[in-house]
Amino acid sequence: MSANLTTEPTAETSPRRKGRIRRVLRWVFFLIIVLVGAFAIYAWATGARQDPIETGNPHMKAVVYTNYGSPDVLEIRDVKKPVPNDDQVLVKVRAASLNPLDWHYMEGTPYIMRAMGTGLRKPKSPRLGVDLAGQVEAVGKNVPEFKPGDEVFGTGGGAAFAEYVCARKTKLVLKPANITFEQAAAVPIAALTALQGLRDKGHVQPGQKVLINGASGGVGTFAVQIAKSFGADVTGVCSTKNLDLVRSLGADQVIDYTKEDFTKGAQRYDVILDNVGTQPLSGFRHALQPKGICVMIGGGGPNDGGLIGPMARPIKTMLMSPFISQKMGMMLAEIRQDDLTKMSELMQAGKVTPVIDRTYPLSQIREAMKYLEAGHARGKVILTMGQDDKT
């Protein structure tokens, strides 16, 4: 009798258990599809893989890669100087900034990117670089907004690591006179990620307590300053050597993560902007107010590869979100001209100043990428055109 009591429920519940497993697997598959779509939209929004029209006789120097791999696959080659179409702007690039996105394209990781169209065995597009600043060289006939000689910054169709690039007119704005080309090149992806993460996802309001995890990095240095411009009480998390930097950006409090774990402290925050991706989600929940918001904008940096890479944490977050009172989600920036203009206004007003860690000439792209890979940059890493020495 006892044997029957133990075996019969198993027989009855096994189909139910299998049904639940199938439903969970379908849900996870759906989330992966959604994230793949989001990443594809992000690539389109940044103009990340749009090759310029390479026609004409003049040549220029550009970074080229024909195989996936380490920075050693990157080469400087002579390529044809692009010619703008009717809706494009030809920019003489003065500076370009490196982003983790460039690293992921170079390595071809996470591998799901290859299935999304970047090329299964070799890159379909041999060029890199999104953020740029420079001078307008020529404009298409449908571009009354700019003229030759204008100083601009924005995004350059996935080919900004070059002496010239064609950019969509909607992805550029005029550069403020009070910042350098190097500073302007640091802005597009990093600053708009911080701006949209805090404003659109975090809904930051004056007086709220906001924590920036990874406050000394490319996105983090912008996030501290933008959050302060919103009137928030800002706490920055960084390493010992970067405490003074983060304080200088306006942080009200700083936490040295080598000595203190903010996820185990008593303080609760209204908004957490996570640019690191190493803490467990349960830790963020502990550090948030009951109705707090956690915005994840990083999945671990350039070394986060594998099959789905930084998408793993957002999938886990989406599965958890319906069952908790706090809001937790990922953030992929969209390069919008009005937000570039907003950043230009903040810089003109002196409320935001881009932080530059190192600059490298175009010829030292391998060294620049290796430094980015190390993951300890204080602010942004910049490429400059027409210079021979690293500064």
Task: Please provide the spans of the model-predicted regions.
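NAD(P)H dinucleotide-binding glycine-rich loop of Rossmann-like/cofactor-binding domains
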Residues: 118-131, 138, 151-214
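Hydrophobic membrane-insertion alpha-helices, especially the h-region
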Residues: 27-41
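Glycine-rich phosphate-binding loop and adjacent beta-alpha segment
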Residues: 279-352, 386-391
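A short acidic, Gly/Pro-enriched loop at the edge of an enzyme's catalytic core
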Residues: 263-271
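Glycine-rich beta-strand-centered segment in the early N-terminal region that forms part
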Residues: 82-97, 111-159
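C-terminal hydrophobic helical "lid"/dimerization subdomain
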Residues: 2-4, 8-25, 333-391
